[in-house]
Amino acid sequence: MNNKRYQHILFDLDGTLTDPMIGITSSVKYALSYFNIEVEDLRSLCPFIGPPLKTSFKDFYQFTDEQADVAIAKYREYFSKQGIFENTLYQGTDELLRLLTENEMKIYLATSKPQPFAQQILEYFHLESYFTFVGGSTFDGSRSEKADVIQYVLDSTDIKTRSDVVMIGDRKYDIEGAKANNIDSIGVLYG
């Protein structure tokens, strides 16, 4: 049995700490309606949860780069006012973060969500005090891939030994991003 004790824990946000289904899918529906694409069932848009938005709009709707950029702007128009709060905290999240902090582990956020939105969500759920650092994507797309976000968190903190670090997330992007940065990962199955 592995008795390894990690000192630095990176968490994904959407699908790992929170259930953002209504907010994200409603924001995607709003963006798609701009292109006269109507969606009846929000659950059909769940694949948008996790990956970078540009990738999703291009993969799922064959948008060009330009169309995807417009869709992202429309998505953020809705999300920044309403979708950000159409979100629920998974049961036990607050207690888990409290216990990790009490056991002197440092907690970081590494999310594909734009950093200001991620910070707002942590504040909305009163979780911000648990986090040593919050890392997210940028609005200009210069840091949108999960591997880049993880690298940003590692570069922006005092983490010296990568073997002391683990990334916890619910999507392949979290696991692949951790691997690209030579850190361990743990996948959750409930997100």
Model features per residue range: what roles?
Residues N2-P47, K58-Y61:
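Active-site neighborhood of HAD-like aspartate-dependent phosphohydrolases
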Residues H8, K146-I175:
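Conserved Lys-Pro-Asp/Glu-containing loop-to-beta segment of HAD-superfamily phosphomonoesterases
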Residues V28, L96-L122:
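Substrate-recognition element of Asp-dependent hydrolases with the DxDx(T/V) motif
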Residues A31-L32, P52-D65, I121, V149-S156:
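Helix-loop "lid/cap" segments that line or gate small-molecule binding pockets
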Residues E38, E128-T132, K160:
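Conserved H-loop
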Residues K58-E95:
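Metal-dependent phosphoesterase signature
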Residues E128-R143:
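A short, structured active-site edge motif that brings together acidic residues
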Residues M167-G191:
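Acidic, Mg2+-coordinating phosphoryl-transfer loop and its flanking beta/alpha structural elements
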